[in-house]
Amino acid sequence: VQQSTSPYFTREAFLTIGRTMKSAGFAAVPYHDTVPSFGEWGFWIATRRSLYNESMITERLERIDNLPKGLRYLTPPLIRASLVFGKHRLATNRTDINTILSGKLHEYYLEGWRHGF
């Protein structure tokens, strides 16, 4: 799991993280939840593409129907809901990834917060 900034305020940064993970050979699926101190916050869950593809990861998460006793927040319906994004929230025309040399992630992060408020 990779915490990945706000998919609302810094959408391009969020999507760049996913593209970068995928370019490194991972199958990656986005999810999000509300974090009290941050608002809507995004994450990517990933595994080696040789083990699972994105559809298989999503299917496994959607099939979770029971969790360990004693959890105070996480529920199976919350897991399923966290995989759903609003219309066009994951759409972009950009295809670039982040590298040490490109700094695209930092650029998109700053751009998002500058225009997000």
Regions found by a protein language model. Name each.
Residues 1-4:
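Conserved beta-strand signature within the Rossmann-like core of class I S-adenosyl-L-methionine
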